[in-house]
Amino acid sequence: MGNKIHPIGFRLGITRDWESRWYAGKKQYRHLLLEDQRIRGLLEKELYSAGLARVDIERAADNVAVTVHVAKPGVVIGRGGERIRVLREELAKLTGKNVALNVQEVQNPNLSAPLVAQRVAEQIERRFAVRRAIKQAVQRVMESGAKGAKVIVSGRIGGAEQARTEWAAQGRVPLHTLRANIDYGFALARTTYGVLGVKAYIFLGEVIGGQKPKARPELPKAEERPRRRRPAVRVKKEE
């Protein structure tokens, strides 16, 4: 059996950027990595109703900058900025550092794969028909201007004894093309029969020249280049 590589991890440094941007030594790396996981876990729990699509984390010394990409920024900010102030205090208490929390709105939620997967999972939990939910999701994505979309649901669909997979797709979803800008999202639908997995792939178009060329070492100028002397060749004259 073949397995699909993670479409975002496959394109890191080419068409996608890292969600955690910082450097640490060997001793501190694992602690900061676990800290990032705790930050994301807290935000996913608190901002689920706001439509959380992505969390970016940057570090510099004892300062942490967290940027949340959400569909409903008003839910994060709260009345008079009360909600975001409480979240900032919770993150500072969790990390023990100075935390700057920034909010960025997702312009079109239908073109964000994590939000599409979350919406399908919510519909399944409310006992929507699975085929109808995934077909409507793909149709909304295509109407929003995507080049292609694919939604997959796996598990005990409809309470069946044997797990199966349902999927719907439109357009192109070239997973092996590195210049293809593909967004990927995953969500869980917790039902009375068990947990169903929802995957969403959205093809947003190709990024021409997305890969950054490697910097070539600068050569010294012609005047500065050391000249190599060729060894003199002695030719014997024939007598």
Curated annotation (Swiss-Prot):
Q: Where is this region: Disordered?
A: 212-239
Q: What biological-process terms (Gene Ontology) are attached?
A: translation
Q: Which GO terms describe its molecular function?
A: mRNA binding; rRNA binding; structural constituent of ribosome
Source domain of life is Bacteria
* UniProt-listed SMART domains: KH (SM00322)
Pfam families, per the entry = KH_2, Ribosomal_S3_C
Listed Basic residues bias regions: 227-239
Instruction: Tell me yes or no: is Ribosomal protein among this UniProt entry's keywords.
Output: yes
Q: Which CDD domains match?
A: KH-II_30S_S3
Q: Where are the transmembrane segments?
A: none
Instruction: Give all residue intervals belonging to the KH type-2 domain.
Output: 39-107
Q: Where is the composition biased (Basic and acidic residues)?
A: 215-226
Keywords for this protein: Ribonucleoprotein, Ribosomal protein, RNA-binding, rRNA-binding
An example GO CC term for this entry is: cytosolic small ribosomal subunit
Please give the subunit comment from the record. Answer: Part of the 30S ribosomal subunit. Forms a tight complex with proteins S10 and S14.
Please describe what this protein does. Answer: Binds the lower part of the 30S subunit head. Binds mRNA in the 70S ribosome, positioning it for translation.
Instruction: State the family it belongs to.
Output: Belongs to the universal ribosomal protein uS3 family.
Name of the protein this chain belongs to: Small ribosomal subunit protein uS3
Q: Which organism is it from?
A: Thermus thermophilus (strain ATCC 27634 / DSM 579 / HB8)
Gene name of the record? rpsC
